[in-house]
């Protein structure tokens, strides 16, 4: 049975309840204060994230877009350059500079890549000389035919240099920078004229469109090919030795030696005084060093296609009259022709052979 609480008991109960509520209220106040701090902190961080994450996303998007644009531009440049070089056949200075930096090939000879830069260097040097000296003599149609002819010639020459490089590697034949420098110095003195390096470089720039490094490259290729030809052409070496022996036995009578050797050598007479600066494989320059009646020893032609012997007849300060015997190199040409016949030369550009387009008369 329940009894009602007395008045005093009721008051005590109320006081006790108030006390409990106060304690709970204090706890609630303390807890709320901490929560307020945490909530405020979370609010600040949330606002920061609100600006931070969109910015990070935007920056990421910019980076991705930049990379994509760069790739597209690079692809367009690559495709454009490829079309210009391999399909259109452009030969301008910009593309030439690109081929000097990038290892691009224009053909392959028996496994040896042919440098595109070598082909363009040979072609541009030939065409620059023609354009600056006699370009006005040709109409557009004739000039286009001339371009095709020189492109074919330059590509074939570049292929020969590549094959010579392959043979040089196999036989451990090298050309040093010192040899190239010595050959350059020899060119400075062609015709007995002591030119300055600066003046000579100006001449080759004006006449052939070549700078010093490109001219050195041409000298290197000529030297390496000449060394290879001397190494593999045992027949030419034997004939040259016979020429030396016969000249000694016949008192340097070039005509008598030529009669004995016949088609094995090439005998030439200038028939009078010629400019000592003639570009004739180095014969005029070599003759300028001699005295009348004196004969040179064996020397390799400046373009590396054979041995020369020269005898001076007479000379002035700037002209020479001489006779010469040439022992041509033939072995390299035979090997190169065999490669062509066997299909071991692959070309990556299409250049028609002008000689093949000439109709044969019946």
What is each stretch, according to the model?
Residues 246-286, 314-321:
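Peptidyl-prolyl cis-trans isomerase
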């Amino acid at each position: 049975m329940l009894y009602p609480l007395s008045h005093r008991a009721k008051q005590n109960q109320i006081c006790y309840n108030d006390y409990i509520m106060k304690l709970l209220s204090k706890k609630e106040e303390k807890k709320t204060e901490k929560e307020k701090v945490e909530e405020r902190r979370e609010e600040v961080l949330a606002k920061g994230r609100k600006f931070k994450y969109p910015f990070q996303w935007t920056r990421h998007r910019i980076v991705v877009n930049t990379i994509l644009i760069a790739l597209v531009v690079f692809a367009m440049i690559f495709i454009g350059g490829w079309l210009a070089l391999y399909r259109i056949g452009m030969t301008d200075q910009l593309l030439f500079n690109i081929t000097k930096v990038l290892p691009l090939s224009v053909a392959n000879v028996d496994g040896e890549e042919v440098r595109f830069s070598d082909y363009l260097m040979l072609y541009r040097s030939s065409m620059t000389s023609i354009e600056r000296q006699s370009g006005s003599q040709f109409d557009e149609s004739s000039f286009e035919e001339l371009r095709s002819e020189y492109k074919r010639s330059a590509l074939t020459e570049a292929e020969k240099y590549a094959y010579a490089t392959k043979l040089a590697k196999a036989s451990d034949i090298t050309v040093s920078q010192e040899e190239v420098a010595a050959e350059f110095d020899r060119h400075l003195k062609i015709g007995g004229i002591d030119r300055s390096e600066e003046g000579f470089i100006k001449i080759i720039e004006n006449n052939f469109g070549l700078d010093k490094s490109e001219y050195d490259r041409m000298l290197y290729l000529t030297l390496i090919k000449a060394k290879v030809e001397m190494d593999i052409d045992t027949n030419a070496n034997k004939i040259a030795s016979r020429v030396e022996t016969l000249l000694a036995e016949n008192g340097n009578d070039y005509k008598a030696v030529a009669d004995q050797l016949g088609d094995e050598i090439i005998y030439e007479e200038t028939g009078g005084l010629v400019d000592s600066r003639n570009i004739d494989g180095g014969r005029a320059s070599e003759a300028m060093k001699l005295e009348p009646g004196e004969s040179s020893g064996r020397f390799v032609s400046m373009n590396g296609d054979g041995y020369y012997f020269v005898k001076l007849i007479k000379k002035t300060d700037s002209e020479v009259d001489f006779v010469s015997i040439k022992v041509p190199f033939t072995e390299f040409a035979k090997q190169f022709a065999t490669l062509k016949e066997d299909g071991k030369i692959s070309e990556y550009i299409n250049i028609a052979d002008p000689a093949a387009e000439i109709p044969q008369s019946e």
